[in-house]
């Protein structure tokens, strides 16, 4: 199995609800370790650039407005098959369609305020990680097992 890195974002609704630790804990419990993490407020330009692939979609303006409405947590998660594993942990984009026990089913309000973002492919993960984190800000480390 391949060790991968993926971008995860705890969106403004997740930060506002005070569930940052719970979300990170879910990733760690499933073998994804944060190797870079930052709390920040996205500018309009950053959000528009990051979501540029959706620029022609009718929801683009609302997405940018939401993603700039409050702080977000940007993370690089590392682990075996990190992209697919992250998407499983998050659940379906629409919380109503998400499986029980996923982040979106448990914490999200609706398809817009769906609490988390995760890269959708290995290729996009590389692009998304580099958008927010220069390589020097990503730190590999080994987990030590507790006795």
UniProtKB/Swiss-Prot annotation:
Localization (cell): Cytoplasm
Location (main, coarse): cytoplasm
Cofactor: Mg(2+)
Record: active site: 117 (pros-phosphohistidine intermediate)
GO biological process: CTP biosynthetic process; GTP biosynthetic process; UTP biosynthetic process
Catalysed reactions, semicolon-separated: a 2'-deoxyribonucleoside 5'-diphosphate + ATP = a 2'-deoxyribonucleoside 5'-triphosphate + ADP; a ribonucleoside 5'-diphosphate + ATP = a ribonucleoside 5'-triphosphate + ADP
EC number: 2.7.4.6
GO terms assigned for molecular function: ATP binding; metal ion binding; nucleoside diphosphate kinase activity
Annotated Gene Ontology cellular component terms: cytoplasm
Function: Major role in the synthesis of nucleoside triphosphates other than ATP. The ATP gamma phosphate is transferred to the NDP beta phosphate via a ping-pong mechanism, using a phosphorylated active-site intermediate.
NCBIfam families linked to this entry: PRK00668.1
Subunit structure: Homotetramer.
Name assigned to this protein: Nucleoside diphosphate kinase
Organism encoding this protein: Anaeromyxobacter dehalogenans (strain 2CP-C)
